Amino acid sequence: MGEEGFLAHFAFSIGGLPITQSVLTTWFIMISLFIMAWSTTYKCSLLQPSTYQLLWEGVLSTMYDAIKEVLPDHVELIFPFVATLWIFILVSNLIGVIPGFYSPTADLSVTASLAMMTFLSVHWFGIRAEGWREYLKHYIKPTPFLLPFHLISEISRTLALAVRLFGNIMSLQLTALIVLMIAGFLVPIPILILHIIEAIIQAYIFGMLALIYIAGGIQAHELKSQGESL
């Protein structure tokens, strides 16, 4: 979380296209998570699981149970997306603790991309549950005059997802930087603990909101089907 790593936003450019430090860190996180996932599944064992395997199984089981509480009938479908969001955002939030690294989630373009992925996934799961004709019809029910309000709601909650995560992580890093500049390294442990706690909370909130939005589209279809069958 050093000053050089935090302020060196633009790393280099390729053909005039700027490659920022958040892009480099995002690539590093994705490659690292891929290697970790591959190494865990490659050496996994049912009879003699390693400590590393048990750790990952515990993390994934916790996320699986959390999703199951919200969408018990669709957990297998939703789990890969929401679990990936949780893990990626958590690592992205925490990596800023390491000197020389920049938290990608302190970059609005990264959080906007994550929010857009969530926006698209909500509609994809909704269309998968209802079919695209029925799904699009709910925007004009009970009256077509509600269409603008539905669209504003979809856009505003997507923007809120992006800005909330960006604002919290950016303010956290700025606060930590200011405190370290004033007090030096006399208070590194409280700042580190604050960063870790906030990183976990923000990753959890983002993933839960994405899960709730997805559940809203799927469960609306299920409630409609139950009402028609009565």
From Swiss-Prot:
Protein origin, superkingdom: Bacteria
Keyword ATP-binding: no
Any one annotated GO CC term: plasma membrane
Function field: Key component of the proton channel; it plays a direct role in the translocation of protons across the membrane.
Subunit composition and interactions: F-type ATPases have 2 components, CF(1) - the catalytic core - and CF(0) - the membrane proton channel. CF(1) has five subunits: alpha(3), beta(3), gamma(1), delta(1), epsilon(1). CF(0) has three main subunits: a(1), b(2) and c(9-12). The alpha and beta chains form an alternating ring which encloses part of the gamma chain. CF(1) is attached to CF(0) by a central stalk formed by the gamma and epsilon chains, while a peripheral stalk is formed by the delta and b chains.
NCBIfam families documented for this protein: ATP_synt_6_or_A, PRK13420.1
Protein name per UniProt: ATP synthase subunit a
Organism this protein belongs to: Legionella pneumophila (strain Corby)
Gene (UniProt): atpB
